Amino acid sequence: MRSSLLWIWFTVFLILQGCVNATVQPNKISKAHTTELKQRYYQVKIKASDGTLIAFTVYQPKLSTNQTAPLILHTHGFGLSRMKRPELSLYGFLLPTGQVAKSAWKKGYWVISFDQRGHGGSQGKIRLTDPEKEAQDVITILNWAEQNLPQLAKNQNGVRVGMIGESYAGGVQYIASALDKRLQAIVPITTWYDIVESLAPNGVPKSNWIDFLNLIGDWWNWNKFDPELKQAYRDTQQQQLNPYIYDFLKTHQASWFCQREQPPQADALIIQGFRDVLFPFNEGVKATKCLQEANRQVHLIGVEGGHLQPFAQHSPLGSTPFWYIGKSIRCGNQKSYDLQKTIIGWFDLKLKDQNSSSELPEVCIDQSPVIQINDLKPITSYDLNKTWIAPNTTQDVFIPIHTANQKSFITGSSLLSLAVETENDDATFFISMAVKSAQTGKYKTLNEQTTPFNPKRKQLYDQIISRLNLKTQNYQDVELPSINTHLQQGDTIGLLVHSQSKYYKRVKQNKVEAWISGQIKLPKLWSEKEVTQQ
């Protein structure tokens, strides 16, 4: 009920936001002229390189004569629209990236909040962060800012620019940064590194989320999907990934650029969530590694939330219903950080050369001892002896892996190497990391995550990605979503196998039967003593 009421409020505010349409054009100021600037905001529309009108709001800071200020670009999540006003807008009064952008403006930053094509006041069709469309729009806005905004701070790369946004607004940051070095500091929040793997893990489409994205992308924003995106959506209804979908989306992700030695050129503060069933924490880990290999300065923050499956997961009281990140975190260095203040402080460091008041570790995960990216690696192998499983709609199967002999902490993703023998060559297994409580004997799925594994579709998926006609393998590798939890003495961590999933409603099967065997690698198990000694 609470989620429904919040959704209604979202709708009301989005309608109100769209009802105010006054547009104020900036005063043309020569590059040599400096003056005292008053704090204000105004609306602008410009043409992209292909003639598409792009709408944005310029937030002008209060600046004294000869004072300069960096620029922060802000944009919105999928199906939403920009911070058109500092109060009467969804981002202006509620969503955290808007709050950060508004705080930056009041602290003396130029801020541009823009509608991505196919959203809000911008024209065009949605192509899901196409490097030649959505990412080029970012570059077009940067060009406009350099030519029209007075007293912009600059360095050897041009205007000193940062960018922030969540989800859909995060994916475009990686790509735009790979294309334009003027973006010097990015804050991608709960977004993808590999959109193909995120939307169709192991070749099985996330039908519930994909249907929801179609609803808000092509129905809420009426008929705004590009024809190619419409076709890709229709193809997912067949419950498998085909070459057409991959060919359309392959360049719309950071992984494409990283694998071709054209990584993002900005330093990054990446925020990713463990309950996020659309873009799991793994996506942030992979992006962090890419940027580190490119010698960029990067911090990874792990929060509890992220994207929640509508009506299947629930956010904490007071949070938005389908997405949240929380307000503060406590890292492995035993320090607490306010998220919004941390982001502003990081922008101050990168764009204003101001020293940060608090040292953020390389990796900061809420309630976890991990402080370095290498701490997340799977390192300990366990054999999975050949076992007969037959999960059905009323009974899941638990496969024990390790029983804790003391209180322990575990954070990171696990790697499965799995062999499956089954008569049904199209059976899908839903695999979760889970803990069996020593006290109650009950199972708990960790971070509400699950991974689909269909041996036949997994092989097709690997062939599409690699462009090779791969031979059938006895063992197939499966990366499980990252977990962040602790075990009490006597608790057992293991795999929980289901025949159905609330995240994949289009997969209909009452029962699956198979012999399974293989190996699993778990991340480090931290003892309580190791944690207290950090």
Q: What residues fall within each predicted segment?
A:
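Short substrate-entry loop that stabilizes the transition state in hydrolases
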Residues: 65-69, 77-107, 112, 117-121, ...
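Short alpha-helix in the alpha/beta-hydrolase fold that links the catalytic acid
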Residues: 280-290
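Alpha/beta-hydrolase active-site loop
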Residues: 129-150
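N-terminal cap/lid segment of alpha/beta-hydrolase-fold proteins
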Residues: 29-67
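Short beta-strand/loop motif that positions the catalytic acidic residue
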Residues: 264, 270-272, 276
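Accessory cap/linker subdomain of secreted extracellular hydrolases
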Residues: 94-100, 106, 135, 147, ...
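Glycine/threonine-rich phosphate-binding loop and adjacent beta-strand/alpha-helix elements that clamp
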Residues: 20, 24-30, 40-45, 352-534
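Catalytic histidine neighborhood in serine/cysteine hydrolases
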Residues: 291-316
